[in-house]
From Swiss-Prot:
Keyword Ribonucleoprotein: yes
Origin: domain of life: Eukaryota
Pfam families: Ribosomal_S14
Cellular-component GO terms for this entry: mitochondrion; ribonucleoprotein complex; ribosome
Keywords of this entry: Mitochondrion, Ribonucleoprotein, Ribosomal protein
GO process terms (BP): translation
InterPro entries: Ribosomal_uS14, Ribosomal_uS14_CS
Family the UniProt entry places it in: Belongs to the universal ribosomal protein uS14 family.
Compartments in which it is found: Mitochondrion
Protein name: Small ribosomal subunit protein uS14m
NCBIfam families listed in its UniProt record: PRK08881.1
Length: 99
């Protein structure tokens, strides 16, 4: 496994771990009915969470090659691997079209 795949997997685990806490803090920060002191306090708590626990830090990568671009979300594989597996018949329900 390449280092990028391992790093991305760790980020996904961190996102799952801190997801509820991050959503809670963000909701309090964005609530304008609360006093500013409380909002700033939770904004500070939000900034203390690990950076890699943010969803935007996760990169969709191919699970076979680690390729970061042109990855199908449904299969989590790149277009190149998808084409190889489809032509071999390894993907159930996917046929190479010919006309």
């Amino acid at each position: 496994m390449s280092n990028q795949i391992i790093r991305d997997h760790k980020r996904r685990l961190l996102v799952a771990k801190y997801e509820l806490k991050r959503m809670h803090y963000k909701a309090i920060c964005q609530d304008r009915n609360l006093p500013n002191k409380i909002r700033y306090e939770y904004f500070f708590k939000l900034s203390k969470l690990p950076r890699n626990s943010s969803k935007t830090r996760v990169r969709n990568r191919c699970i076979f090659t680690g390729r970061p671009r042109s990855v199908y979300k449904l299969f989590r594989i790149s277009r190149i691997v998808f084409r190889e597996l489809a032509s071999k018949g390894s993907l159930i329900g996917i046929n190479k079209s010919c006309w």
